């Protein structure tokens, strides 16, 4: 009888431990075009509705000058010391250089394939190369930010976890597994259910995600997402966890 009670007590403790475990969650939108970060905001709002006791902070690296991004992220992590960091990677940018030439990747490849004019051919492939280089540059930069964020947060909580999701991830999720620290959760799709289960300590096997260092399930991207009921976003709450909220409302810079 006594033993049974102890077992129950341990279970209870374990549950509480898990709750405490993710007491602080930092959501980071990785650099991209500064468009209002509706996706990650909905996530933060959803977490707050499910777990009102969890402390959250939100940072949007899209509005930070690119040469200050790394320092800014490090400072935020030092101040907040999160147990879980969610990185949202909106899309892979297509940077048009100043001369505007490398604008359209499809246009470039078509020019290469179909033009008789050799100069045009060279220009086409050069545009494509520039574009590929900027993709790689961005992938390198963002994966470096994730690695740095994890390392920094581990100084304060050695069991800190990282989840990476967003539009770009859905596109090349298979390649990311090798570029990120082992154990990073790579999420394809929305992420609300995944986060809810993860914070509760439930199994996330059914969710559209996989751990860096393991192989993703075959055709992961084509699995049906499990629906979540969308509710109105509590913008008062969002303002409280994201000091720069008004940057967008006031029309940028």
Language-model-detected regions and their locations in the chain:
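Acidic, low-complexity intrinsically disordered segments
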Residues: 1-253
């Amino acid at each position: 009888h006594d033993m049974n009670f102890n077992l129950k007590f341990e279970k209870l403790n374990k549950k509480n431990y898990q709750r405490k475990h993710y007491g602080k969650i930092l959501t980071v939108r990785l650099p991209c075009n500064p468009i209002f970060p509706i996706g990650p905001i909905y996530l933060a709002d959803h977490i707050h509705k499910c777990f009102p006791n969890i402390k959250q902070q939100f940072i949007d690296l899209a509005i930070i000058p690119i040469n200050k991004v790394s320092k800014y992220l490090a400072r935020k992590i030092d101040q907040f010391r999160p147990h879980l960091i969610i990185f949202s990677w909106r899309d892979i940018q297509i940077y048009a250089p100043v001369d505007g030439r490398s604008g359209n990747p499809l246009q470039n490849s078509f020019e290469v394939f179909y033009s008789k004019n050799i100069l045009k051919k060279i220009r086409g492939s050069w545009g494509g190369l520039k574009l590929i280089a900027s993709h790689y540059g961005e992938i390198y930069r963002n994966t470096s930010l994730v690695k740095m964020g994890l390392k920094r947060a581990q100084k304060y909580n050695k069991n800190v976890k990282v989840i990476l999701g967003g539009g770009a991830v859905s596109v090349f999720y298979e390649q990311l597994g090798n570029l990120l620290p082992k154990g990073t959760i790579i999420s394809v799709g929305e992420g609300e259910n995944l986060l809810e289960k993860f914070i509760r300590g439930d199994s996330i096997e059914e969710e559209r995600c996989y751990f860096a260092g393991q192989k993703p399930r075959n055709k992961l991207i084509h699995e049906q997402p499990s629906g979540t009921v969308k509710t109105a976003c509590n913008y008062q709450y969002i303002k409280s966890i994201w000091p720069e909220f008004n940057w967008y409302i006031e029309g940028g810079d």
